[in-house]
UniProtKB/Swiss-Prot annotation:
SUPFAM superfamilies per the UniProt record, alphabetical: Arp2/3 complex 16 kDa subunit ARPC5
GO terms for cellular component: Arp2/3 protein complex; cell projection; cytoplasm; nucleus; site of double-strand break
Subunit and interaction comment: Component of the Arp2/3 complex composed of actr2/arp2, actr3/arp3, arpc1 (arpc1a or arpc1b), arpc2, arpc3, arpc4 and arpc5.
Start and end residues of each stretch annotated as Disordered: 21-46
PANTHER family from the UniProt entry: ARP2/3 COMPLEX 16 KD SUBUNIT P16-ARC
Keywords per UniProt: Actin-binding, Cell projection, Cytoplasm, Cytoskeleton, Nucleus
Gene: arpc5-a
Family classification: Belongs to the ARPC5 family.
Location in the cell: Cytoplasm, Cytoskeleton; Cell projection; Nucleus
Gene Ontology terms for molecular function: actin filament binding
Record Pfam families: P16-Arc (PF04699)
Protein name as it appears in the record: Actin-related protein 2/3 complex subunit 5-A
Protein function: Component of the Arp2/3 complex, a multiprotein complex that mediates actin polymerization upon stimulation by nucleation-promoting factor (NPF). The Arp2/3 complex mediates the formation of branched actin networks in the cytoplasm, providing the force for cell motility. In addition to its role in the cytoplasmic cytoskeleton, the Arp2/3 complex also promotes actin polymerization in the nucleus, thereby regulating gene transcription and repair of damaged DNA.
Length: 150
């Protein structure tokens, strides 16, 4: 018989360390995320640069933070940009986004559906239609199954 069969070293392995469902508080990683720069977005909207406003609004999303006011501020800013787009410019704007930005846009669209305001539902449905046409059903699945929310 081998000598190491009575060894107890295997008992020192923490199997919970390898569990993918284990809760890990990632608050420290998201401390610096305060959301998109409102001044940059507002100046792009006033200047008529809607594509730049959309890019700026989707930049630096407050995903890893638990600060709800930062998340609400970012949601309102993105919603403001989406509402200010003309209907015929939406498709071109969505096509200019990469895969991650389109998924982030879909997260904001679904977040906007949670709390509808004046005219936001109709505009969000137009954006959803165009984003779905560009990104496909996979984008919806990624948004609905994502653990990190906006």
């Amino acid at each position: 018989m081998a000598k190491n069969t009575v060894s107890a070293r295997f008992r020192k392995v923490d199997v919970d360390e390898y569990d993918e469902n284990k809760f890990v508080d990632e608050e420290e990683a998201g401390e610096g995320q305060q959301g998109p720069d409102e001044g940059e977005v507002d100046s792009a909207i006033r200047g008529g640069n809607m594509m730049g406003a959309l890019q700026a609004a989707l930049k630096n999303p407050p995903i890893n933070t638990k600060n709800q006011s930062a998340k609400d501020r970012a949601e309102n800013l993105v919603l403001k940009v989406l509402i200010s787009f003309k209907a015929n410019e939406i498709e071109k704007a969505v096509q200019s986004l990469d895969k991650n930005s389109t998924d982030l846009l879909m997260k904001y669209i679904y977040k906007g559906f949670e709390s509808p305001s004046d005219n936001s539902s109709a505009v969000l449905l137009q954006w959803h239609e165009k984003a779905l046409a560009v990104a496909g059903v996979g984008s919806i699945v990624r948004v609905l199954t994502a653990r990190k929310t906006v």
